[in-house]
Structures are given as C-alpha cells and as structure tokens.
C-alpha cells in the first residue's frame, strides 16, 4: 500500500502544472543610448548595497536601478579611475569594490567617492595591475 501511494503521488506531481513553480524573469537591455558608457561590458558585480557595477572599455558604470553613474580616468583628478578599460570587479568582506584595469588595480571608497590605487614598494617587484582579486575565508586578498 505504501509503495502504491508513493507511485501515485509521484505520478500526480508530474501531471500538475509547473507554472506555479516557475517565475518569468524580467530582463531589460541597456546600451549607451540608455546611459551605459560603452556597449561592451567585460564584467558585472552587484554589491552589498544593491548597486550594479559594469566594467567596460570606456569606464566603470554604477547603476542604481534608474540611472547610470559613470566613473572614468581623469588626469586632473588623482582619485579618479587609473584607466578606463576595466578587466574585473570584486567586492571584499569589508565592502570595498576592487577594480582591475588594464594598467592598475584600485579600490573604490564609498565614504569619499574616490578610487585609491594599489601600491607596492619598489623592492618587491610586484606588478601594478592584476586580472582577478579573490578573498579567502580568513579575509586575505589574493591578487592574480
């Protein structure tokens, strides 16, 4: 009897409409016509505050759900992005947004709305930029 009930319930579950189990996903396509700095997006990140970040060939784009804010390199602003070509993005456990560009690696500080480059002393011969940043369980950042 128990086997019969299991088979009956299994068969009935296959016959039930699955529309209640699935949800239609809503996608909106954004281009430079809607405010994105460039139509080619290399990386994307949703941060802990809910912002969407998009790295392009022409700067870093922060999207709040309504409009884009574009961050670009500006030689007259030392706290701007170091380069407009964004390779990858990463948010660490402290909420810092790390940005890997084609020439430097930096992090974004929400408090000052500024970018700060990652610097090394000349003695350790470290590169100025990396392609990826990750964090381990102990909070150590791994630069690759």
Question: Model-flagged regions — what are they?
Answer:
Residues 1-144:
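Carboxylate-rich, polar loop motifs that coordinate divalent cations or form catalytic acidic clusters
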């Amino acid at each position: 009897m128990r086997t019969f009930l299991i088979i009956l319930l299994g068969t009935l579950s296959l016959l039930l409409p699955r529309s209640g189990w699935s949800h239609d996903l809503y996608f909106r396509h954004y281009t430079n016509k809607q405010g994105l700095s460039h139509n080619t997006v290399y990386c994307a990140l949703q941060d802990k505050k809910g912002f969407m970040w998009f790295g392009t060939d022409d700067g870093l784009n922060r999207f709040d759900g309504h409009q884009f804010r574009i961050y670009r390199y500006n030689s007259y602003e030392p706290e701007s992005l170091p380069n407009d070509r964004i390779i990858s993005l990463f948010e660490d456990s402290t909420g810092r947004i790390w940005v890997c560009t084609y020439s430097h690696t930096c992090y974004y500080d929400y408090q000052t709305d500024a970018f700060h480059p990652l610097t090394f002393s000349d003695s350790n011969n470290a590169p100025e930029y990396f392609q990826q940043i990750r964090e381990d369980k102990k909070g150590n950042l791994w630069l690759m």
